UniProtKB/Swiss-Prot annotation:
This is Peptide deformylase 2. Belongs to the polypeptide deformylase family. Binds 1 Fe(2+) ion. It comes from the Bacteria. InterPro entries: Peptide_deformylase, Peptide_deformylase_sf. Its cofactor is Fe(2+). Removes the formyl group from the N-terminal Met of newly synthesized proteins. Requires at least a dipeptide for an efficient rate of reaction. N-terminal L-methionine is a prerequisite for activity but the enzyme has broad specificity at other positions. The active site is at 150. The keyword Ribonucleoprotein does not apply. It holds the Pfam family Pep_deformylase. It is an enzyme of class 3 (hydrolase). Fe cation binds at residues 101, 149, 153.
Amino acid sequence: MKIVTTDSENKAVLYKVASEVEIPLTKTTKEKIEAMRIFYKSFQGKAGFAVPQVGLSERIILVEQHLFDTTMAEETDEPTILVNPSWRPISDKKEWDIEGCLSVPGKVGVVERYVHVELTAWLYHSDTEALSKIKREYHREYSSVLWQHEIDHLEGKIYVDKAKLLLNEKDFYSFRQQLIESGKIQSGMALFDLGPLIYDIVVKGEIPS
């Protein structure tokens, strides 16, 4: 199992609307989920991935637990596994966010996303192989964007198609560090604050004072 990128031979799966997963889960689906859970734990530096990103056109995503349960104090390598997830905006407020993607290595983009969303899904419990229906609201920057990004994958969409601005990852982080060292921005600045700022600097040439 490996991540499918936009340069992979089987990249077509990234642009296909994923199939709804049968509930209750079949034995085959549970075996696939277990294989993906093990794969998820094998690499670092991820917020999560949607199943089409590993070559399967099914509506399942795996994400870091602390992004699903924002009250968690510590991180774990066990993913939260969501089946047939969907989201909807619960306010009209949008902000520019900076995003990257395992399927588009070496790039980051500025994308407009809703700030406040409601997530609905079946939560899979790997220890018991049971499902429970969940509905949660998210108002934090990273989590609210995550659901939009990952569920886009289930709709055959990749963030670069929505990006207002696309940059090389190395150039972005180098530029960000220059801005920090010059005192133009703060190192802990939220992405919803950094996104529009980077856009203004690169596109409009407006350097913050």
